[in-house]
Design a protein with these regions (language model features):
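Flexible, acidic/Gly-rich N-terminal and inter-domain linker regions that tether
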Residues: 1-37, 46, 382
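C-terminal scaffold of the Radical SAM
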Residues: 28-37, 55-82, 86-369
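Conserved N-terminal Rossmann-fold NAD(P)-binding element of oxidoreductases
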Residues: 40
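Local cysteine-cluster metal-coordination motifs and their immediate loop/turn environment
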Residues: 43-56
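Short amphipathic alpha-helical interaction segments
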Residues: 367-381
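A short, conserved structural fragment
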Residues: 380-390
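Short, amphipathic alpha-helical interaction segments positioned at domain boundaries
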Residues: 397-411
Length: 411
């Protein structure tokens, strides 16, 4: 979530095919099958955060929201033909800064999804938002058109850290936005970034305890990483930015687990914590290797077709993507069928991030061979992985060396 100058469309009047009270939207007749997700990428921001390498863009001259909406709806038509008769369990508006979209735009996209597929009665519909006062004023509109989960990009709880991270809001605005979000939405998540420059274990413990006291049902807690091509990377390479690494980074991660679990928000994924039952259903689709359609500039998709997994991605430039959609009906610039080995490696990579781990039988079914028993037994004996009930999971010690585990198991 990360900010822009957009003229929003008005909120439309209620429509007969739309319900926002938990009822199923008018669907096409379809068979029930594995959950399917739709990710919608809104790429525009008010400002680019110096640590961010996401596909986000600043347009000081404003954005033609109506024209972009027409492109989103047209690309949805295309994906409906690629993945027909699916049951949509989640919709996720990400970015960029989706809270710069008008509620009318969000509503039209949800309606289009409901018209193309079955939108499940209890579908999770998440929108990422920044906590600025202007964007917080839109929360009621988003709830009215069907959004039922809000994810706030808080990132830090003190003004000095927010300024260092290039954020556009203050700590007071963040707390006010969080309180407002909890009034409008039953499910609220917010993000924090830790392992920031100069941050000590004591300071992070105090900040995290404060965050846990706000009683959101989901927290995403990310260690700051230096991403190539960002202003932070340039400063880091020049010796002007120093972030915790090694033993301190490890200590901060362990401290995070020690504080969150007793507070009722255990880690269900490396960086994500939730009260049981409040996990992000959309992100679980990714980590469980299930299918999803990615709509918008730079969005990625995974769609099973003919028993094989297709990996699709779109043009990153917003205007370039829109031009292609207007000309061809979609903005895709890559459509690759993964080999059995590639699909298995991806399932391994994603599944080991989860506390629940991955299904070993499913992994073996993907590539026909499964994992090397000798390597697996060695990692078990080192206390890095566990096998139980046909599932493989990284232990807390294993999650500290997750990249090593994946490399060894995928070899």
């Amino acid at each position: 979530m990360r900010n822009s100058a957009v003229t929003p469309l008005p909120v439309p009047p209620p429509q007969g095919a739309r319900e926002t009270d938990g009822q199923a939207r008018t669907p096409k007749a379809q068979s029930r099958q594995e959950p399917f997700g739709v990710y919608v990428h809104w790429p525009f921001c008010r400002a680019k955060c110096p640590y961010c390498d996401f596909n986000s863009h600043v347009r000081h001259g404003g954005v033609d929201e109506a024209r972009f909406l027409a492109a989103y709806l047209r690309e949805l038509d295309h994906f409906a033909s690629l993945a027909p008769q699916r049951s949509v369990a989640s919709i996720f508006f990400g970015g960029g800064t989706p809270s710069l979209m008008g509620a009318g735009t969000v509503s039209a996209i949800i309606d289009s999804i409901a018209n193309h597929w079955t939108l499940e009665r209890d579908a999770e519909i998440t929108l990422e938002a920044n906590p600025t006062s202007v964007e917080a004023e839109r929360f009621a509109g988003y709830r009215a058109v069907g959004v039922n989960r809000l994810s706030l990009g808080v990132q830090a709880l003190d003004d000095a850290s927010l300024k260092a991270l290039g954020r556009q809001h203050s700590a007071l605005e963040a707390l006010a936005a969080l309180a407002l979000a909890k009034r409008h939405f039953d499910r609220v998540s917010f993000d924090l970034i830790y392992a920031r420059e100069g941050q000590t274990a004591k300071a992070w413990a105090e900040e995290l305890r404060n965050a846990l006291g706000f009683a959101a049902d989901h927290l995403s807690l990310y260690q700051l990483t230096i991403e190539e091509g960002t202003p932070f990377a340039a400063r880091h390479d020049a010796g002007m930015l120093h972030i915790p690494n090694g033993d301190l980074a490890r200590a901060l991660y362990l401290l995070t687990q020690e504080l969150c679990e007793p507070a009722g928000l255990p880690a269900y994924e490396v960086s994500n914590h939730a009260r049981p039952g409040s996990e992000s259903r959309h992100n679980l689709l990714y980590w469980r290797g299930q299918d999803y359609a990615g709509i918008g500039p730079g969005a990625h998709s995974r769609i099973t077709s003919g028993g094989a997994k297709r990996a699709l991605s779109a043009i990153k430039s917003p205007e370039g993507w829109r031009a292609e959609v207007e000309a061809r009906g979609h903005g895709l610039d890559s459509d690759e069928t993964l080999s059995a080995e590639e699909a298995a490696d991806e399932y391994l990579l994603m599944g080991l991030r989860l506390s629940e781990g991955l299904d070993l039988a499913r992994l073996a079914a993907i590539d026909g061979r499964g994992l090397d028993e000798t390597r697996l037994s060695a990692l078990e004996s080192q206390g890095l992985v566990t096998r139980e009930g046909g599932r493989l999971a990284a232990t807390p010690s294993g999650r500290l060396v997750l990249n090593r585990l994946i490399l060894e198991l995928a070899a």
